[in-house]
Amino acid sequence: MSDRSLRVEAVVLRHSDWGEADRLLSLYSREAGKLRAVAKGARKLRSRKAGHLEPFTRVALLLARGRDMWIVTQADTQDAYLPLRESLTLTGYAAYVLELLDRFTYEEGQNAGLYQLLIDSLERLVVVTDTFVVVRYYELHLLDLLGFRPSLTACVNCGRPIQPQDQFFNAQMGGVLCPDCGARIPGSRPVSMAALKYLRHFQRSSFAQALRAQIPDATRAEMEALLSYYITFLLERGLNAPAFIRKVSQD
């Protein structure tokens, strides 16, 4: 295939209106990482492409190089993950998975590990009832693949191994602090040993092993809050999907 065209498998991260009838797509592809592409006429009622280009659809695409960005010439749905569209809560979690990847990545080439994590996570949301494990596992392994793995085994300030007691976490320093260091370093927040134990377990385990963990509700809430704090620090802004998830969970 010439350098004027590209065939990829990709997940649609988001789309927006472009011109009078077109749609601008943000894609994450297996072959080329993050891409932007225009789907000509996708907003027209009779467009054959429109149904293949909705967010969290996995789609096979043929792209042609335009003046400034790729143009979609063919689109064929591989998996629409329909159950994720039938529940507002699952829609929210799927949107969070996409938004997190979208905010953290740029158009910088292939990353097969990230693409596989994305596909695995969408499939897990379809079949696994414990969405907490799916999402926390995704967050931790996404951070790992992006080079932001939080250090959870030794104090990031003094280097001493973590002892079986409550500790501190500092987002700016990228990991856990022992009680002595955490108490005197600004920006540190307490974290229980139970939360650290399960976060470390998720980091080093397979998804199947993580799914077997029996995690108390209070510890789940603490893990979610700590990862949200760390991710918000890294992105320097909040995300939209968590507020939607909270709203539909309360309704």
Task: Set out the residue ranges of the language-model regions.
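Non-catalytic alpha-helical scaffolds and adjoining flexible linkers that form interface surfaces
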Residues: M1-D251
